[in-house]
Amino acid sequence: LHILHLASGEGVELIRAAKDKGIKVTGETCPQYLMLTDEDGERLGSAMKGYPPVRGQSDQEKLWEGLMDGTLSFVCSDHAPHLPEEKRKPLWEAPAGCATIETMPLVLLDSVAKGRLTLNMLVKILSEQPARIFGTYPQKGAVLPGSDADFVIVDMGKKYTFSQKQMHSRTKLSP
């Protein structure tokens, strides 16, 4: 059983309890749930509308705890590239979802820079764990002889400012 797009601390607790009982279950969350809280709603409006909705600070902390202790297996993009004019509609009319495929690595690398994650943990949650869970490891998710050479080189000493103008997605709007 795989539970996707966890946004609540209660969901993390349910997965943890199931694992403690020996139930084979995995779960993941998305960058918006790790980086935003319901307090960002006034500033971002419909841009952060998603299903499930972004929750409070305590839920966010439990998501981080679940990610760090292995209760949650990885972070996925849940990329939903709606046009800016669609996302600027009133909350109940705007489509749900965020354009996160381009920003996910950046916000998680920022978490590495701030000491919340290690680079090794980042590799595990973005590459190794998804490959293991979905049966593509070690062809994917590993740097080993015979594996696909899918990797990214980053310079953690270099400062980088992301701009919406740099986005390649259909939308140039990402929380």
Show the residue positions of the predicted features.
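Short, surface-exposed loop/helix-turn segments at secondary-structure junctions
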Residues: 91-92, 161-175
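Histidine/acidic residue-rich metal-binding segments in metalloenzymes
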Residues: 2-75
